[in-house]
Swiss-Prot record:
<feature type="site" description="Lowers pKa of active site Cys">
    <location>
        <position position="139"/>
    </location>
</feature>
<comment type="function">
    <text>Catalyzes the transfer of endogenously produced octanoic acid from octanoyl-acyl-carrier-protein onto the lipoyl domains of lipoate-dependent enzymes. Lipoyl-ACP can also act as a substrate although octanoyl-ACP is likely to be the physiological substrate.</text>
</comment>
<dbReference type="InterPro" id="IPR020605">
    <property type="entry name" value="Octanoyltransferase_CS"/>
</dbReference>
<dbReference type="InterPro" id="IPR000544">
    <property type="entry name" value="Octanoyltransferase"/>
</dbReference>
<protein>
    <recommendedName>
        <fullName>Octanoyltransferase</fullName>
        <ecNumber>2.3.1.181</ecNumber>
    </recommendedName>
</protein>
<dbReference type="InterPro" id="IPR045864">
    <property type="entry name" value="aa-tRNA-synth_II/BPL/LPL"/>
</dbReference>
<dbReference type="GO" id="GO:0005737">
    <property type="term" value="C:cytoplasm"/>
</dbReference>
<feature type="binding site">
    <location>
        <begin position="142"/>
        <end position="144"/>
    </location>
    <ligand>
        <name>substrate</name>
    </ligand>
</feature>
<feature type="active site" description="Acyl-thioester intermediate">
    <location>
        <position position="173"/>
    </location>
</feature>
<feature type="binding site">
    <location>
        <begin position="155"/>
        <end position="157"/>
    </location>
    <ligand>
        <name>substrate</name>
    </ligand>
</feature>
<dbReference type="InterPro" id="IPR004143">
    <property type="entry name" value="BPL_LPL_catalytic"/>
</dbReference>
<keyword id="KW-0012">Acyltransferase</keyword>
<keyword id="KW-0963">Cytoplasm</keyword>
<dbReference type="Pfam" id="PF21948">
    <property type="entry name" value="LplA-B_cat"/>
</dbReference>
<dbReference type="GO" id="GO:0036211">
    <property type="term" value="P:protein modification process"/>
</dbReference>
<feature type="binding site">
    <location>
        <begin position="75"/>
        <end position="82"/>
    </location>
    <ligand>
        <name>substrate</name>
    </ligand>
</feature>
<feature type="domain" description="BPL/LPL catalytic">
    <location>
        <begin position="36"/>
        <end position="211"/>
    </location>
</feature>
Length: 233
């Protein structure tokens, strides 16, 4: 049973289209410098074209990246692709304060996506052998987290209305021949803007937060020189 976090507010930030590396650094800085009283946050972002290689990533799963950069990431999992038309949602949750474990958070994220897709009349499911969300045998959402000092960062990437071709240049999440799909292939005309409010609402509902409070986001707020940088994103 999930906790009720009504006494803990959660902040929503809309980042728009951003390159991966500076946003990842900002997320690391937020996590490193947050305190026991820092509100949890959700960041919604679309990334410019990039492959990210997770901690478990193997070089043989990067087939032909071509002109798309490959960046090492400290999230869980293996290689994946991010690009415009894919909704990335980073979840910065204090698990100790919420009194939940990593497995509970993963389940909440997967259920968030499943319920979001159901809103658009798309049947989907999670798999015990491969994190993420699937429509039949095709993957529609990837998931990768990292926990530091009891707080989560990184999150999910939901394919909505994007060019799926770059996934053919890798073995997605380390699975050769993994077929990818997206919301617009199953429900034509659905956009990122359509999905965003449903995704946020379902995530806050899964964990019992009150309504997420939208606040402005500025990259410079997170990349101050006093914040130490990390070479692993």
């Amino acid at each position: 049973m999930m906790p009720r976090l009504q006494q803990h507010k959660i902040i929503l930030r809309q980042l728009g289209l951003q390159p991966y590396a500076p946003v990842s650094q900002a997320m690391h800085n937020f996590t490193e410098f947050r305190t026991d009283t820092t509100p949890d946050e959700i960041w919604l972002v679309e990334h410019q074209h990039v492959f990210t290689q997770g901690q478990a990533g193997k070089a043989e799963h990067v087939l032909m990246p071509g002109d798309i950069p490959v960046i090492q990431s400290d999230r869980g999992g293996q290689i994946t692709y991010h690009g415009p038309g894919q909704q990335v949602m980073y979840v910065m949750v204090d698990l100790k304060r919420a009194k939940i474990g990593v497995r509970q958070l993963v389940t909440a994220i997967e259920n968030t996506v499943i319920e979001t897709l159901a809103h658009f009349n798309i049947d989907s499911h999670a798999r015990p052998d491969a994190p993420g969300v699937y429509v039949e045998q095709q993957k529609i959402c990837s998931l990768g987290l990292r926990i530091r000092r009891g707080c989560s960062f990184h999150g999910l990437a939901l394919n909505i209305a994007m060019d799926l071709e770059p996934f053919q240049r890798i073995n997605p999440c380390g699975y050769a021949g993994m077929q990818m799909t997206q919301v617009s292939a199953l429900q034509p005309g659905v956009t990122v803007a359509d999905v965003q409010p449903v995704l946020v609402r379902e995530f806050t509902r899964q964990l019992g937060y009150p309504t997420a409070k939208l606040q402005p986001w500025s990259l410079s707020d997170y990349l101050l020189s006093s914040h130490s940088s990390s070479s692993v994103l």
